[in-house]
Curated annotation (Swiss-Prot):
GO molecular-function terms, A-Z: spermidine synthase activity
Pathway: Amine and polyamine biosynthesis; spermidine biosynthesis; spermidine from putrescine: step 1/1
Family: Belongs to the spermidine/spermine synthase family.
One GO cellular component, as annotated: cytosol
Assigned keywords, A-Z: Polyamine biosynthesis, Spermidine biosynthesis, Transferase
Protein name: Spermidine synthase
UniProt-listed GO biological process terms: sorocarp stalk morphogenesis; spermidine biosynthetic process
One Pfam short name: Spermine_synth
Active-site annotation: 161 (proton acceptor)
Amino acid sequence: MDKIQNGWFSEISEFWPGNSFSLEVEKVLHHEKSEYQDFLVFKSKSFGNVLVLDGVIQATERDEFAYQEMITHIPLFSHPSPKRVLVVGGGDGGVLREVVKHPLVESVTLCEIDKGVIEASRNFLPNMRVGFDHPKVTLFIGDGMEFMRQRKGEFDVIITDSSDPIGPAQGLFERAYYELLKAALAPGGIVCSQCESMWLHLDTIKGLTTFCKELYPNVEYAYTSIPSYPGGSIGFILCSLGGSTKAPIREITPEVQSQMQYYNGEVHKASFVLPQFAAKKLNL
């Protein structure tokens, strides 16, 4: 609660020194410390309800769709037949909501280490919680890395919806994790993981893409605009055992497109077009 001063929440972190994003608070809805992290939910004046983990904004009702749609539909529309999907993290439910929009998906497993995040979403993020009770969804509360050690060659698409590489999410940005991801993929499978902002963490992104290129035949980086995240954008690393993920390879039907607020085929392709400073550094 020390992040709220004089009616304003400010996101201050050593992971983006010298930067801060603030929202005016209308009402604190929930605050709790779990075994893994501190989580806070508040109603803001301009961004709706806001979920905060360890002082860092994870989702706001105003702009969450820009992240959830892109991290989900880029890999799913890049795969010819995504039947089995795994989501690591994603306890707010947003990625689940997007995955089950795909008729081809037969099953989706959510692996979340902290059940408190799921409960907070169920109680305070009504537009994000809708996927939890879908018949195609299975919830697993526990360590994602341990879960994948028991799964080999099983998933067509794996999405890592993690927080930043500090605290409980640190291991999700390391080589050993991407080795587990690769082993859990079916032939032609695709990994898509949250991969920070090129404006603030280009060296982190470079390190990740460098070792991923040693593991996967195709490694690419995309990004989306989202005002409530540091730097106003967030990126995704796409690691494919098949072809490129830079354009959708299946039809985006009018029925599916009508459910989107951000994603479409042109945005999919444009998200891989990097400004020169990032393209030069990442050399993808």
